[in-house]
Amino acid sequence: MTATVEDPHPQINAEIAKWVRNKDLVLDGVNVSQRLRSFQTPILCVFGNQDGVVPPGTARAHADDMASTDKTILGIGTKSSPFAHGDLFVGTGAHHQVFEPIAEFLNTRLR
């Protein structure tokens, strides 16, 4: 996969760029980033090490801002086997490296 999504919708790309630049995601006038700071439920943050859509630092920063005491940060990919945004869903190894840890995270909290 490529490091970014090819031919993204310009409006979506602009929203993501604004979110990354301002470090705040605002949707329909609601500052989602501020609301997440009071989020208490378990958090699983998954990102690819070469994600060009939501860079790892951005994903990690928002997870770090959340109030939950039950946080799992799952960075996928290595220098020799990088993961971009789309790789998280359809990349080689996604089943084992992404979906199995997600299932485990959910299963341990639903018991």
Language-model segments: residues:
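Active-site rim elements
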Residues: 1-4, 29-32, 86-93
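Short beta-strand/loop motif that positions the catalytic acidic residue
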Residues: 39, 45-47, 51
